[in-house]
Amino acid sequence: MGAVIDDSMPGPGADATGTGPSDARTERETRKLEKRLCRAVGKAIDDFHMIEAGDKVMVCMSGGKDSYTLLDILLKLRARAPIAFDLVAVNLDQKQPGFPAHVLPGYLASAGVPYHIETEDTYGIVKRLIPEGKTTCSLCSRLRRGILYRVASELGCTKIALGHHRDDILQTLLLNMFFGGKMKSMPPKLVSDDGQHVVIRPLAYVAEKDTARWAAQRNFPIIACNLCGSQQNLQRQQVGQMLREWEKKLPGRVENMFNALQNIVPSHLLDARLYDFKNARATGLASADGDKAFDPQELATPAEQVVQIVPTRRSS
């Protein structure tokens, strides 16, 4: 199957407000969502020094909700930023059968965004090398990454912005723990192996539900990927569903897990490359890395697990 587009949506980037009685509430919620997205993306950019004055940022566009949201919010932030930087949207047309090649150019032109469409038949390569029924995501990702690095160099881009969000980062952490035996996730900023490119993820603090809501509000012309993202029973989809179920049962758990990625205590893990366990000896001096070994851990109790025992009177 090839890529598909939801033609039921209005034009690119159009506002989803109507004329019904709930207009005011809808507009208010939209403003709140926009403010939350801008604040989260702005904080990530600032925390990790993602964008600097004079940067030319290549925004990778897949046609999905996340990349549309990324570009839209970066455009809003650029308009009010105290520094000048350029944005160029780049899409890789992988020659999937039925891919609506007109959609992104039409949207980007109407939005006044400089763009570049790179055409490479990675679809044919993947279908030729991967047996039917096997997951194509890994090879497709490697091919796409190499092409995007090349295009970034050709366009003179200093940063490459990807649309991965908070949920992607957590899913990657759990996938690596469950199936790779390592604690590794998606970094908000990294330098490519050859030292030539800087990759940034400005949506690192953004929840997937917010990109979905923003895409619906803005009526982006979404293009679905049927080569990898829509295959059923992939490990990432299963982990994503697990996270959603956890959040439903215990609201706040996913946020706590994400916060843990920014609050690492190497002395309380088992990686001797991060902490010198071999030379850990009693010195008689207090240490910030030490621990009151026999004290109970102070952990927040999930609200749904709190049981209040109320004494009842015996009937006489």
Curated annotation (Swiss-Prot):
The gene is ttcA. [4Fe-4S] cluster binds at residues 137, 140, 228. The thiolation reaction likely consists of two steps: a first activation step by ATP to form an adenylated intermediate of the target base of tRNA, and a second nucleophilic substitution step of the sulfur (S) atom supplied by the hydrosulfide attached to the Fe-S cluster. Homodimer. Residues 1-31 are annotated as: Disordered. It comes from Verminephrobacter eiseniae (strain EF01-2). Residues 10-21 have a biased composition (Low complexity). This is tRNA-cytidine(32) 2-sulfurtransferase. It catalyses: cytidine(32) in tRNA + S-sulfanyl-L-cysteinyl-[cysteine desulfurase] + AH2 + ATP = 2-thiocytidine(32) in tRNA + L-cysteinyl-[cysteine desulfurase] + A + AMP + diphosphate + H(+). GO terms for cellular component: cytoplasm. Catalyzes the ATP-dependent 2-thiolation of cytidine in position 32 of tRNA, to form 2-thiocytidine (s(2)C32). The sulfur atoms are provided by the cysteine/cysteine desulfurase (IscS) system.
